Amino acid sequence: MAVISMKQLLEAGVHFGHQTRRWNPKMAKYIFTERNGIHVIDLQQTVKLADQAYEFVRDAAANDAVILFVGTKKQAAEAVADEATRAGQYFINHRWLGGTLTNWGTIQKRIARLKEIKRMEEEGTFDVLPKKEVALLNKQRARLEKFLGGIEDMPRIPDVMYVVDPHKEQIAVKEAKKLGIPVVAMVDTNADPDDIDIIIPANDDAIRAVKLITAKLADAIIEGRQGEDADVAFEADIQADSIEEIVEVVEGDNA
């Protein structure tokens, strides 16, 4: 059975693509139809490809892979942080700093500085420093935590990267490809899928859609690490004519 059901995808709005004028023709094979100026994603393919992504991530986790979640848009930031943390992995949910992967040595120095400031506070150094200096240190720590807090304890460059919206995260994807890191991504109808190793055709602008897919990949990691079977999605009342039902839903929602 599928790890995510058609019903779950519909309820989360995963089928809504972008306006047709904003599409990337390379996504044509993942589009079922167009309604009212909006592309409708073929959820039968999403179900199948989500299964492939789940298996890939689960197997990677079973081999102790380091997995980095990336999603810096506001719709993704919370889910990326929450689900990566739940799975015991790492995340970047604010601006991607150029060179995060390709210049890992420099990033490690910034992380070391973050840890140093934290240690200074824990050891009571802040108590003997001038208030102005403490304020500057706190400001520096806040900035470092914002951009690097999610990878503070990442032991090495990741083995796998999961991305929400590779169109927005082009720099991150390019760095991963340069280093040979496989990329799993939620890919909307406006994105270029060429640099993505495992594509999940999906609406990457809806919070519920991002949460659904991201949580399922976190489940895959947990299953891979712990050997626990994740919940399997049952199709309930959406079966063979599901694509036609998708069109009806889209027409209803855009009427």
Curated annotation (Swiss-Prot):
Could you say which protein family the record assigns here? Answer: Belongs to the universal ribosomal protein uS2 family.
The name this protein goes by in its record: Small ribosomal subunit protein uS2
Q: Report the InterPro entries cross-referenced here.
A: Ribosomal_uS2 (IPR001865), Ribosomal_uS2_bac/mit/plastid (IPR005706), Ribosomal_uS2_CS (IPR018130), Ribosomal_uS2_flav_dom_sf (IPR023591)
Q: Which organism is it from?
A: Streptococcus pyogenes serotype M28 (strain MGAS6180)
Q: List the disulfide bonds.
A: none
Any Pfam family the entry gives: Ribosomal_S2
MF GO annotations: structural constituent of ribosome
Keywords of this entry: Ribonucleoprotein, Ribosomal protein
GO CC, alphabetical: cytosolic small ribosomal subunit
The record ties this protein, via PROSITE patterns, to: RIBOSOMAL_S2_1
Please cite one Gene Ontology biological process associated with this protein: translation
Q: Which domain of life is it from?
A: Bacteria
Q: Does the keyword Transmembrane apply?
A: no
Work out whether the entry's keyword set contains Ribonucleoprotein: yes
